Amino acid sequence: MATLREIRTRIKSVKSTQQLTKAMKMVAAAKLRRAQDRALQARPYAAKLKELLDSLSGKVDTTINPLLTPRSEVKNVLVILVTSDRGLCGAFNTNIIKMAQRLIDQDYADMSRQGRVKMICAGRRGNDFFRKRGYNVVYGYPNIFNQLDFNAAKEIVEKATELYLSGEVDKVHVIYNEFKNVVSPNLISEVFLPIAPSKKDDAGSDAARQNKLVPIVDYIYEPSPEAIINELVPKHLNTQLWRVLLESNAAEQASRMTAMDSATDNAKELLRSLSITYNRARQAAITKEILEIVGGANALEQSA
């Protein structure tokens, strides 16, 4: 059985940890409010751009823009993975990394063995994980969420489109956590390039479902749809990836707040258990001392 001193030391350690987790929960809650607002505000704009692009795609020959044209054969694939920079956010990174591994090691197993699956990792956790295991990470952004801005999304899109247009990859996937609620995010894996028109029965992400709720309008375009579509495609890609980063950031803060709340509750329960153990040990020590005193007194009486 642990000594009173050892139990006191452990109680002090747990109290210190509890203060830390409680503070982290409060910080995550404050960040979540800002991140959630940014993510939700980005959804309508991204949805409207997608609606316009779908409308235009039905009026023109999509072969005018290579980013709209599927390749006849997919020989090389690029995976854009979005994780967090920091830990202590529950299963946030674990689940999304597992999804990426399944896509690469199962769906594209043959390509992966031949080194024909490339990765762009946004976030330190995913970047470190896949680099250490020998995956073909061509670009990494390990501190992207320290100062998240639109230029970060534009840079990733530029790298992805360069690889696609040069023929180095024939398909681009994006995998990320989409903010759903405070309890759990949506794990999303979708095709980023080539840009495909939205399907009527596509369940997809919350953002995709929001897009379905927007009525399709038969627009009159000026100048020509062909000119507009070439201007709209890069804006659409930049906006969609920016939304992905915002969604992931909001989901990360929600996961961290939930994880720290759970850790604080666990620390509280552990303190209660340690207090009971300490009181029992203290009572046992006092009882032992009393017995020793009584035993000593009896011995003195007998010797007298």
Curated annotation (Swiss-Prot):
Pfam families: ATP-synt (PF00231). It is found in: Cell membrane. Keywords: ATP synthesis, Cell membrane, CF(1), Hydrogen ion transport, Ion transport, Membrane, Transport. One of its GO terms (molecular function) is ATP binding. It is a peripheral membrane protein. One of its GO terms (cellular component) is proton-transporting ATP synthase complex. SUPFAM superfamilies: ATP synthase (F1-ATPase), gamma subunit. InterPro entries: ATP_synth_F1_ATPase_gsu, ATP_synth_F1_gsu, ATP_synth_F1_gsu_CS. One of its GO terms (biological process) is proton motive force-driven plasma membrane ATP synthesis. Produces ATP from ADP in the presence of a proton gradient across the membrane. The gamma chain is believed to be important in regulating ATPase activity and the flow of protons through the CF(0) complex. NCBIfam families: ATPsyn_F1gamma, PRK13425.1. F-type ATPases have 2 components, CF(1) - the catalytic core - and CF(0) - the membrane proton channel. CF(1) has five subunits: alpha(3), beta(3), gamma(1), delta(1), epsilon(1). CF(0) has three main subunits: a, b and c. Belongs to the ATPase gamma chain family. This is ATP synthase gamma chain. The gene is atpG.
